[in-house]
Amino acid sequence: MRGGVNMASIKDVAQKAGVGVGTVSRVLNNSGYVSDETREKIEEAMKNLQYTPNELARNLYRKKSGIIAVLVPTVEIPFFAELVHNIEAELYNEGFKIMLGNTDKAHNAELEYLDMLNRHIVDGVITGVHSLDVEEYKKIKKPIVAFDRYLGENIPVVAVDHKEGGRLAAEILLKNGCKKIVHFRGSTAVESPYHERHFEFARIMKEQGVECFDYELAWNKFDLEYYKYAVKDLFDRLDEWEFDGIFGTDLVAIECMNEVIRRHKKVPKDVKCVAYDGTYITQIVEPSVTSIVQPIKELAQEAARLICELVNGKTYKNEKVTLGVSVRKGRTTMK
């Protein structure tokens, strides 16, 4: 007895079940043959003794930690917060815990998590960050799933149909009579599926003869203060350009709405607005924001499925899972 708690050992279990320690070990690690009768005796002994297996020792034996690292720039962004929440729930159902890495404020954090993968501290990595050179990922032949980024032919990618998302956003603004549109686009410094929505949006606007001002956001910047700076910077540049439509990710779109109001104009009377991602924040602001919605729960399910399959030995080549997007109407595009 230690501190009033019965600290039973594997030897105690073996003695109570009338078997050798090696037999108990095979049951714990699910390795080698053990008859059903003997297995039942061991499980009953464990129950009676309230024996809890040493998870660390068992993982060392199996060379598995039961942990998946999930890397995002920051959970301060609602999209990443919802994604992590859903990935954690999916992996928990598969017997895994997550190790969360917010990488935007930590130099070399992404590389350090990959080193942990190499050293078996984590079993796999799901990454949605854009800070590390692709060549670093190509060196690693371990379970990795990429979210919205191309990292190499052996690393599966999970994304949405961004081209369709760009088309839907363009159609909404055009149907609402917008003639001069501000388009916030992600950085072109990394190769990512999300570029497809910007290309399609810009293509349609050009095809329709609509003026469109593209503002490229800085690489690897995912915080509200930067978005506030970027929006004010753009509005100052376009002070004399009477734009009437805005397209950007949720936080950018909402900050644009705030800036429109600060400049004594109204949404949607003077400026229409469409957001991309469709997280909960687009529904709790006033007016509610018309959004192109990414199916975050389904994206998380696919990422979790792929990483579990990779951990269990499956391999992929040039695998890309693409999910559809949808439109959720808000009051920012009402006529």
Question: Where in the sequence are the language-model features?
Answer:
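Hinge/beta->alpha junction and helix N-cap segments in small-molecule ligand-binding domains
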Residues: 73-82, 100-108, 158-168, 184-233, ...
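Flexible loop/hinge segments that line or gate small-molecule binding clefts
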Residues: 128-168, 188, 277-289
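Short acidic capping loops at alpha-helix termini that bridge into adjacent secondary structure
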Residues: 180, 213-214, 267-272
